């Protein structure tokens, strides 16, 4: 009865002709796995469930490579500071944009709107602070003779706070034409003042490089260090409605002065045979978000009482911008991870809001009920809010089946109107040589995959309405069987015997259940045999592998070097070593042959074998003997 039941399951997963080794199921149901795919108009929550994303509207393209800074005035006009031509653009509430000012320096690194509606712009390198009126006419407001103008903030009294580098100075300027000496507010021991922010009580906050500090200056100018991060740079600061300060810290590898490296390609999901008994690696334990030993980006929440929490960190994702939720519960984070925008709450819960498919979300800000994002290296302005897309598409990562595979069924868990399609090909990255997307499947109970046999497979989900939600997708497949390989044979010196080590003791209930001991945290590493003295013994040990993960059986043969026919010594071996009694063989020169077969894991018509010959070796069991040579010669008492 058990055999009939198992066959029925196998037939359900693979209603096709057998052509391979062990069946496998590729399951995508975790946040980590889902984030490896492409989110086109979909959000991904903390459990990995996919749902329609906010509608992302492209408002304006500057034609510049970079948008370094942004600001909004009381009328809702948006100002964009760009590089590398020093241009500032203004975009009105209807999305109409135009060049507003063209400054002499390369980069407009900072923008701020004054109390009277004027625009302040900080430029770099060898920059100045400009005041720009409503007509776009720019005049020099302050020239501190500093290399970089990194940040600007308007104080409650109307004065302009200016963060600079490479000397880490903060200036406070109340009127045009002030000298650097008279306007110096605070000279830190840091190299750069990268970010500035002001709260409703008039406190000024400064984020530094290269010490990664957050400094607070009370209205009377008294400084106090709130945070000393192990990361190099405080890249952005945002004040929440409850007075909390959110600080984005970057590591040495991604700080402002460093070029942004291209993320490493995501490894492909590998084939996992359904009942292969290969040792399973222990799962990597989740790190505390307070463990910053390998962090690239970190977001801190500094509470009004001075305490601080880490609410987000990533060893892989580089973040560049923050915008505080007006609810007081967390921030939006703009990244260089496919231009993705994440939402993180104060308790550390993380959700992918949307993916812009741009290289970098350089600034994030809100106005009224909408959020705005600027991107680089195509300087664009986007808007999104509460309205959801009418249709979203999620494309999975690519499954690498390790060999050409026959596809079985695909089934999933969803709510609302969700359609699934598949495609396959033999190149690692989908291109024009792949098959077209299959016809849409709508029954989540599953259907046979129609994509052709290939090494790689991808699926996509189309979410057709606002109620659509996808939480899991499963793909069954059967990789083509690949012959095992015998990689090496070693013949040990005479008199060394090999014996198996005692097996690891396992609860008999686990053994009889048929479950993998690894499911119970029992790791059984392959153990090398014990070497013992055994007079006359000749031992051999070999290494072999099977790319399908099939269990292998071995046979050992031998022949004299001058013969052509091998004789069987032992078959159906499951261990990769064997010892023979050397006294059972006549003196001479011999060769071993090892064969490996995966027949135990495959139907007979698909089983494959491999073989390898050893180097010749000598058997010499005869005792040494002394024989006379020539006639003895006697001289006195000496004979030779």
Labelled PLM ranges:
Residues 22-24, 29-33, 38-41, 337, ...:
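Beta-strand-rich ligand- or partner-binding modules
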Residues 23-55, 130, 171, 215, ...:
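Blade/loop signatures of beta-propeller domains
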Residues 24-34, 250-294, 604:
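Short, conserved, GDST-rich strand-edge loop motifs in beta-rich repeat architectures
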Residues 59-63, 100-104, 141-145, 185-189, ...:
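Surface loop/turn motifs at the tips and blade-to-blade linkers of beta-strand repeat domains
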Residues 72-75, 113-116, 154-157, 198-201, ...:
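Residue-level detector of Asp-centered blade-edge/turn motifs that repeat once per structural unit
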Residues 77-80, 118-121, 159-162, 203-206, ...:
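Conserved beta-propeller blade signature
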Residues 87-90, 127-131, 169-171, 213-215, ...:
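A short loop-to-beta-strand structural motif that recurs across blades of beta-propeller domains
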């Amino acid at each position: 009865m058990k055999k009939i039941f198992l066959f029925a399951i196998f037939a359900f997963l693979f209603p096709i002709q057998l052509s391979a080794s062990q069946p496998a199921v590729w399951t995508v149901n975790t946040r980590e796995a889902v984030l490896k795919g492409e989110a086109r108009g979909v959000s991904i929550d903390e459990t990995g469930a996919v749902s329609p994303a906010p509608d992302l509207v492209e408002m304006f393209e500057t034609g510049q490579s970079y948008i370094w800074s942004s600001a909004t005035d009381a009328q809702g006009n948006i100002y964009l500071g760009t590089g590398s031509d020093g241009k500032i653009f203004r975009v009105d509430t209807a999305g109409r944009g135009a060049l507003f000012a063209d400054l002499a320096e390369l980069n407009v690194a900072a923008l701020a709107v004054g109390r009277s509606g004027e625009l302040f712009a900080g430029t770099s390198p060898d920059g100045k602070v400009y005041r720009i009126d409503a007509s776009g006419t720019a005049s020099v407001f302050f020239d501190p003779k500093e290399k970089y103008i990194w940040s600007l903030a308007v104080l409650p009294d109307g004065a302009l706070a200016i963060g600079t580098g490479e000397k880490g100075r903060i200036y406070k300027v109340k009127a045009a034409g002030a000298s650097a000496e008279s306007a110096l507010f605070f000279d830190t021991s840091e190299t750069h003042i990268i970010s500035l922010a002001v709260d409703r009580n008039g406190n000024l906050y400064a984020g530094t490089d290269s010490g990664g500090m957050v400094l607070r200056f009370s209205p009377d100018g008294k400084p106090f260090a709130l945070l000393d991060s192990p990361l190099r740079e405080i890249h952005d600061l945002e004040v929440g409605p409850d007075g909390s300060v959110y600080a984005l810290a970057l590591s040495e590898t991604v700080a402002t002065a460093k070029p942004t490296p291209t993320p490493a390609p995501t490894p492909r999901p590998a084939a996992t045979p359904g009942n292969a008994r290969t040792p399973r690696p222990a799962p990597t334990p989740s790190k505390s978000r307070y463990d910053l030993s390998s962090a690239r980006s970190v977001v801190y929440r500094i509470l009004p009482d001075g305490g601080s929490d880490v609410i987000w960190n990533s060893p892989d994702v580089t973040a560049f911008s923050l915008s505080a939720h007006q609810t007081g519960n967390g921030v939006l984070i703009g990244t260089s991870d496919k231009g993705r925008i994440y939402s993180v709450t104060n308790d550390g819960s993380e959700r992918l809001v949307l993916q812009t498919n741009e290289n970098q979300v350089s600034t994030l800000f809100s106005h009224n009920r909408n959020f705005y994002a600027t991107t680089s290296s195509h300087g664009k302005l986007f808007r999104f809010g509460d309205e959801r897309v009418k249709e979203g598409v999620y494309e999975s990562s690519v499954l690498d089946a390790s060999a050409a595979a026959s596809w079985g069924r695909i089934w999933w868990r969803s709510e609302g109107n969700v359609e699934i399609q598949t495609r396959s090909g033999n190149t690692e990255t989908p291109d024009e040589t792949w098959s077209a997307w299959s016809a849409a499947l709508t029954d989540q109970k599953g259907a046979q995959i129609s994509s052709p046999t290939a090494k790689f497979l991808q699926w996509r989900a189309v979410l057709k309405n606002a109620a659509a939600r996808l939480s899991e997708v499963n793909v069954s497949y059967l990789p083509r069987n690949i012959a095992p390989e015998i990689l090496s044979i070693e013949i040990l010196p005479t008199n060394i015997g090999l014996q198996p080590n005692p097996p690891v003791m396992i609860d008999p209930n686990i053994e009889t259940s048929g479950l993998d001991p690894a499911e119970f945290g029992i790791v059984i590493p392959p153990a090398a045999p014990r070497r013992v003295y055994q007079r006359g013994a000749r031992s051999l040990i070999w290494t072999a592998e099977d790319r399908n993960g099939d269990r292998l059986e071995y046979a050992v043969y031998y022949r004299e070097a001058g013969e052509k026919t091998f004789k069987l010594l032992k078959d159906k071996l499951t261990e990769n070593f064997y010892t023979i009694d050397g006294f059972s063989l006549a003196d001479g020169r011999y060769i071993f042959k090892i064969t490996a077969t995966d027949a135990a894991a495959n139907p007979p018509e698909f089983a494959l074998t491999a073989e390898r010959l050893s180097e010749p070796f000598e058997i010499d069991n005869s005792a040494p003997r002394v024989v006379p040579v020539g006639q003895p010669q006697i001289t006195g008492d000496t004979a030779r």
